[in-house]
């Protein structure tokens, strides 16, 4: 089977969030299962030159966009055995950031149309298009409404993955006529209309042959008003074509036994080496090098979604415990300033790195004991999966992918891989942190918990098998 991934970002070329990690790792795992996957993304000027230089011009076409025919170069290259196509147009993709521009509706209308217009010119007969998030959602809708009468397209199936329902691609009504070349009959509540505007994600949901989300719990949550971002009714309507497949992590990147970024490599049989990473982390941040004081870390975007209001509410109570705390991330200024203030107030216990540093992030995972992730909502989450892989015990709220991947430890049955709480409540979180700290004081219990976490499989293998089965069912190959 031939699968075309349509994505707005992809590791190793360009990344702004978890979508890029998925687009980079899942195709590699699918390839191991015999699936022929190719990936199409924009040729951003921000892609490093050393990654771009191996691409060759495959074809030049023109994409109809309203009254214009826009230049579209199709570049072709290979990376790690996977074929990639870059859609080239400097007007749309030579920018200083991936998103957040006044003409994003036009940019990704062009990209969606370019994907479809390029299909006849690829040396690759596309059986199924797998699109992701709002940026390529209209591929599904346009394919269904404008291209299906063409024999080249009539058999193509679509899978649409929602990574984060919060970002939907909502644009003025004029986009329907001026860019998508669709008539007024599509501007109604059963089609693209969304509170007076149009909604790309809504179009993707309506037209896709199947919809996936990035965890089973998130699939259920988004059908309720609290999580549904005004699309919960639509998702309930299409529940029969909606499923949840939890993400994995790329174990060629996140593997403490092979990680070149950390001070000392280790695995479940050489856990004694993990303490060297803890000492190195304490030394790097200027923390007292105390082996028996647990390090609680957060590697995260500093935003409301990540549950930082809970952390802020009880942080000073956490500081009354014998702990050290390391925060790595950037985001909203109110949270950045709060953690910088805490680092000043508790200079012997709290250290903060505002920004992101890939090498340092690996060292934080390797050197920490506990990983705090009390999200308000979390479609899947990668941080807790990386933490488990590195033997760092997560403390999470039971939402989305956190609920699917972290199970609370029970001392009687010795089951579980972390500590969880249900309500979005600061003192529930505080109680759970204190509970985890009590177990940390018992080395026998803690070592067993760490080993259980590290022996779980959080790779993409299980997820890739689920996606292959889904593709097979849609293509009726099984």
Curated annotation (Swiss-Prot):
InterPro entries documented for this protein: Glyco_trans_1 (IPR001296), GS/SS (IPR011835), Starch_synth_cat_dom (IPR013534)
Annotated residues for binding of ADP-alpha-D-glucose: 15
Enzyme class: transferase
Domain of life: Bacteria
Keyword flag Transport: no
Catalyzed reactions per annotation: [(1->4)-alpha-D-glucosyl](n) + ADP-alpha-D-glucose = [(1->4)-alpha-D-glucosyl](n+1) + ADP + H(+)
Pfam families attached to this UniProt entry: Glyco_transf_5, Glycos_transf_1
This protein's UniProt keywords: Glycogen biosynthesis, Glycosyltransferase, Transferase
Pathway listed: Glycan biosynthesis; glycogen biosynthesis
A GO term for molecular function: alpha-1,4-glucan glucosyltransferase (ADP-glucose donor) activity
This protein's name: Glycogen synthase
Originating species: Bacillus cytotoxicus (strain DSM 22905 / CIP 110041 / 391-98 / NVH 391-98)
């Amino acid at each position: 089977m031939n699968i075309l991934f349509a994505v707005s970002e992809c590791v190793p070329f360009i990344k702004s969030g978890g979508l890029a990690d998925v687009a980079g790792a899942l195709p590699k795992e699918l390839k191991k299962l015999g699936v022929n996957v190719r990936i199409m993304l924009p040729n951003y000027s921000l892609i490093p030159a050393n990654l771009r230089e191996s691409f060759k011009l495959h074809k030049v076409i023109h994409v109809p966009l309203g009254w214009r025919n826009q230049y579209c170069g199709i570049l072709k290259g290979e990376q790690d055995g996977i074929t990639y196509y870059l859609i080239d147009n400097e007007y749309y993709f030579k920018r200083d950031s991936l998103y957040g521009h006044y003409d994003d509706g036009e940019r990704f209308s062009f990209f969606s149309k370019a994907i479809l217009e390029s299909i006849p010119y690829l040396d690759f007969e596309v059986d199924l298009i797998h699109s992701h998030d709002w940026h390529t959602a209209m591929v599904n809708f346009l394919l269904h409404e404008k291209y299906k009468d063409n024999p080249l397209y009539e058999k193509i199936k679509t899978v649409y993955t929602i990574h984060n329902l919060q970002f939907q691609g909502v644009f003025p009504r004029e986009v329907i006529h001026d860019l998508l070349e669709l008539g007024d009959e599509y501007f109604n509540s059963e089609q693209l209309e969304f509170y007076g505007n149009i909604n790309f994600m809504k179009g993707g949901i309506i037209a896709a042959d199947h919809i996936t989300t990035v965890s089973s719990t998130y699939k259920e949550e988004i059908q309720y008003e609290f999580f549904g971002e005004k699309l919960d009714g639509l998702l309930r309507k299409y529940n029969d074509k909606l499923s949840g497949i939890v993400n994995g992590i790329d174990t060629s990147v996140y593997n403490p036994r092979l990680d070149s970024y950390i001070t000392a490599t280790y695995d479940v049989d050489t856990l004694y080496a993990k303490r060297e990473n803890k000492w190195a982390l304490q030394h790097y941040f200027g923390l007292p090098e105390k082996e028996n004081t647990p390090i609680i870390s957060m590697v995260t975007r500093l935003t409301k979604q990540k549950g930082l209001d809970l952390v802020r509410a009880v942080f000073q109570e956490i500081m009354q415990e014998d702990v050290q705390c390391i925060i790595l991330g950037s985001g909203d200024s109110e949270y950045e300033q709060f953690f910088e203030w805490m680092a000043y107030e508790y200079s012997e216990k709290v250290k903060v790195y505002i920004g992101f540093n890939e090498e340092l992030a690996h060292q934080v995972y390797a050197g920490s004991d506990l990983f705090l992730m009390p999200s308000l909502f979390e479609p899947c989450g990668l941080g807790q999966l990386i933490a488990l892989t590195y033997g760092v015990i997560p403390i999470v709220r039971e939402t989305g992918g956190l609920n699917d991947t972290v199970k609370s430890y029970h001392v009687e049955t010795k089951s579980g891989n972390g500590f969880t709480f249900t309500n979005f409540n600061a003192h529930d979180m505080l109680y759970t942190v204190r509970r985890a700290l009590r177990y940390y004081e018992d080395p026998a219990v803690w070592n067993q918990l760490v080993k259980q976490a590290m022996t779980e499989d959080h790779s993409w293998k299980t997820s890739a098998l689920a996606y292959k089965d889904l593709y097979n069912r849609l293509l009726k190959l099984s």
